[in-house]
Amino acid sequence: MYSIKQILESRKEIFGNEDYIFEKVNGSFLGKTYGEFVDDVYGFASLLQKEGLVGKKIAIFAGNSYAYMVADAAIMGFVGVSVCISKEWSAESLIELAEQIELDAMIYGDGQKEKVDALRLRFEKIKYIPIETVAGHAPTCELIDDLVDPSGCSKIIFSSGTTGIPKAVMLSQNNMFACWKDLCRRAPLDSSDVDYLFLPLHHAYAGICNFLY
């Protein structure tokens, strides 16, 4: 079975200096190499560890962005449980989520501030982290890289709720990457391939296959 750490390290050896993610910022596309992405993941993971969030449930409540990808990989691989939720959720849904799964922290986008403020009034002990503070932390030797069990829950996603109440689904790294090596053999990728992220990252396909695979 494979883990996020193994995938990041193996891919960094091959694609470390290659462009990995392009994000449109103020009308222009800014590129990040795979090596820069891995460094940002390690840097943010070490910051979350210092904040005492190891083993905790951390929600990501924001639209698609490079910072979202960094946060998701950092939490799942080295910190705790990434709880990915739709940026369209209401304040009432956030409050219900916080109560049901005992949320410990939330990374939120700028457009979600009003909803997050409503949550903050009810749950002062939750740690609130603006998503713009995620990337850019230098990786340090203080990162402990064996705190997360690949067979335990690393990610919680929710069904769409179109036919009823959204249902939480718990995934381990072993679940998520069970087919990773087979896919690499069947559809080998190189730096000339282009993958367009067309779904929100809280979707299972976008957040796993479209991004991490």
Summary of predicted features, one role per range:
Residues 1-20:
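A short N-terminal helical cap/helix-turn-helix that marks the beginning
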Residues 16-19, 140-158, 165, 188-194:
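Conserved pre-ATP/AMP-binding loop-to-beta segment of ANL
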Residues 20-52, 56-65, 69, 73, ...:
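Conserved AMP-binding/adenylate-forming core of the ANL superfamily
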Residues 31-34, 154-180:
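Conserved AMP-binding A3 loop
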Residues 38-43, 169-190, 195-198, 208:
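Conserved structural elements of the adenylate-forming
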Residues 74-78, 206-213:
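Conserved short alpha-helical elements in the N-terminal third of ANL/AMP-binding
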Residues 87-116, 179-196:
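Conserved ATP-dependent adenylate/AMP-binding module captured primarily in the ANL superfamily
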Residues 111-150:
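ANL superfamily adenylate-forming
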